Every structure is written in C-alpha cells, then in structure tokens.
C-alpha cells in the first residue's frame, strides 16, 4: 500500500504517463466528459472530494507547463477562483517558477477537454470549478 502522496492508483498512473504538454482536467460534478476521454470519477457526494483538495493532490505529483481555466470562473464563482489562484501562487513560489494561467470561454474550455488524457470528476458543486493542467518536464 502506498503511504504518501496521491493514493488513487488510476490518477497516479495517468500522471506518471503524461508527456510534455499532455493535458489532465480536474472538474466539478457537472462538467460533461467527452466520449473517448478517460474518466476518473472520484465524486462521492456533494463536496466530497472538493475541487481544491484534488487540485492540491495533483500538484503534489505533476510537473506543470501551464493551466487553463474558464473566464466565467472569475465572475460566477469568484471565491473558489480566488482560492484556486492562491493555491497556484503558493505552488509557483515553492517551485521557484511561474505557472501561467490561460483563460478561455467556457464553451471553448469544454471543447478543449476532448484533448485531455483523462478528466478527474470531483464532488464539487461550484459552477465553473474546472482546471486543465498542461504537463511540463522536470528538466
């Protein structure tokens, strides 16, 4: 049994297989998951697990190039958006490098998820609480 870090075997395996610029999406309970994209469904009930908790777990193991968010997230769910930005800023400081944040319209965000290697569904009930991580390289 794994003792630390990311305990979900499917998610840990997907992250270990990512190459430079591969995409991994973490989403709220309502984001449609395109046919053909692997679904890792962690949702148990409302808020369990939370979007932020899953984001933090992914950040423990994934090297990042950038992230993508929906523009609407800033206005519709500003508290959760600000919490996420704070997490990303802390992670950026720990890594000693910027994590660029790209914003797109939600309709385009959903279209872009078709390119994700996998989509991780959380129990989050906050509108637009979705993020796509673009994999970086460790060297």
Swiss-Prot record:
User: Which annotated residues bind substrate?
Assistant: 28, 106, 128-130
Active site at 20 (proton donor)
**Pathway, per Swiss-Prot/TrEMBL?**
Carbohydrate metabolism; D-ribose degradation; D-ribose 5-phosphate from beta-D-ribopyranose: step 1/2
UniProt-listed Enzyme Commission number(s): 5.4.99.62
Q: Which Pfam families match?
A: RbsD_FucU (PF05025)
Record PANTHER family: D-RIBOSE PYRANASE
Identify this protein by name.
D-ribose pyranase
The organism encoding this protein is: Maridesulfovibrio salexigens (strain ATCC 14822 / DSM 2638 / NCIMB 8403 / VKM B-1763) (Desulfovibrio salexigens)
Q: Which gene encodes it?
A: rbsD
């Amino acid at each position: 049994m794994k003792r630390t870090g990311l305990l979900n075997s499917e998610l840990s395996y997907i992250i270990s297989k990512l190459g430079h610029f591969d995409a991994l999406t973490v989403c709220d309970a309502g984001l449609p998951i395109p046919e053909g994209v692997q679904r890792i469904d962690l949702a148990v009930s409302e808020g369990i697990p939370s979007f932020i908790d899953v984001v933090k777990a992914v950040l423990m193991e994934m090297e990042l190039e950038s992230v993508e968010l929906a523009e609407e997230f800033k206005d519709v769910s500003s508290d959760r958006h600000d919490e996420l930005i704070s997490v990303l800023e802390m992670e950026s400081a720990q890594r000693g490098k910027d994590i660029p944040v790209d914003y797109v319209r939600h309709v385009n965000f959903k279209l872009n998820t078709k390119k994700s290697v996998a989509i991780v569904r959380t129990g989050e009930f906050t509108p637009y609480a979705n993020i796509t991580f673009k994999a970086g390289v460790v060297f």
